[in-house]
Regions:
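Substrate-binding clefts and catalytic carboxylate motifs of secreted carbohydrate-active enzymes
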Residues: 2-118
Length: 118
């Protein structure tokens, strides 16, 4: 599935509140490239942008929890110069530096209204 495929997904659910968790993509802080380049901050933003389009079409959503907030040590992640023993799906790098996706998520939280499920 491509990130833009999420734009057209339709959800039909009963009147129940929904929390969406563990979504997003990996990116190494400071690694830049095209919106389709794996591990680039731009690719992480692109994935989130399309996921937000889908999420905004689900009126019952009451909360969003990204895959992880901050990159963390994960011994099985061994791609040299990209993972170096870290899970890189965070909005913040392991040293606390904000990735581009942090600002996108911050904006999404500010714009999203919360109320009763319809």
């Amino acid at each position: 599935m491509r990130p833009e495929d999420a734009d057209n997904i339709k959800w039909t659910l009963p009147q129940k509140p929904i929390l969406i968790s563990e979504f997003g993509a990996e990116a190494k802080q400071g690694n830049h490239g095209s919106k389709n380049q794996r591990w680039a901050e731009e690719q992480q933003v692109n994935v989130y942008e399309h996921q937000f389009v889908m999420i905004n079409n689900i009126p019952q959503v009451r909360g969003l929890i990204p895959w992880i907030l901050m990159d963390f040590r994960s011994p099985g992640r061994n791609i040299p110069k990209l993972q170096d023993g870290f899970n890189r799906k965070g909005l913040l790098a392991e040293d606390g530096k904000k990735k581009q996706a942090f600002y996108l998520f911050q904006k999404a939280y500010k714009e999203r209204s919360v109320g009763k499920a319809e």
